[in-house]
Amino acid sequence: MEDITEPEGGEVILRSRQCGHCKVAECVDIGVMDFEKLVAFAGEQAIDLVVVGPDDPLAAGAVDAFENAGIRVFGPRKNAAILEASKAFSKDLMKKYNIPSAAYETFDSPEAALAYLETAPMPIVLKADGLALGKGVLICSTREEAKEGVKTLMLDKQFGSAGDRIVIEEFMTGREVSVLSFVDGKTIKIMTSAQDHKRAKDGDQGLKYRGD
């Protein structure tokens, strides 16, 4: 692997606890949600650009914190990160602007969700509304699986408050492709498409997993 610690006279510093990262960059052990310490560190080190990757700090306003301190930062602000942080918000937004997506219903109570499942067609997809480390989506083949999924998300709180609200969505087949675009308010730059193979095991088996 190419050494990127000093590209063209610069330096890469990662907020990371993963030992593999430390082979290619300087790593600092600061909590990813400790914005005060992260902002202070960036200021002390005269960091030219901060790139925020993980979902949780983006949703909590990490980019806003760096911007408020006058530090250049790449990533969506809190009011934009909600597109990832709330599936219900995203689905409602797509519905409002007629952006095609799978049919859905949103539920705040397990009783209402279970009642809906009595007549819903199977298979069906259950999604925790909030962030769940890439694991909050359940594809259920039978009504029994779907009911157990509601229990897992809303009653057992397997993903904490992320499951306080759930989205029950139409099951669709086909290839899933991600296309990212960078936008500055005036210009859109579309990146190369990519596929995220989310299952933990080969052959589309196992639970969904974010891959780290």
Which residues does each predicted region cover?
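A conserved helix-loop-beta module that forms one wall/lid of the active-site cleft
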Residues: 74-136
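Short acidic-hydrophobic, aromatic-tinged amphipathic segments that line or gate anion-handling sites
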Residues: 27-34, 105-109, 140
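Conserved ATP-binding module of the ATP-grasp superfamily
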Residues: 100-102, 123-125, 140-178
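Short, charged, surface-exposed secondary-structure boundary motifs
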Residues: 23, 39, 82-88, 201-203
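Short beta-strand-to-turn element immediately C-terminal to the catalytic PLP-Schiff-base lysine
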Residues: 107, 137-142, 181-184, 191-192
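Phosphate-binding core of ATP-grasp and ATP-grasp-like enzymes
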Residues: 153-157, 172-212
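ATP-binding N-terminal substructure of ATP-dependent carboxylate-amine bond-forming enzymes
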Residues: 1-78
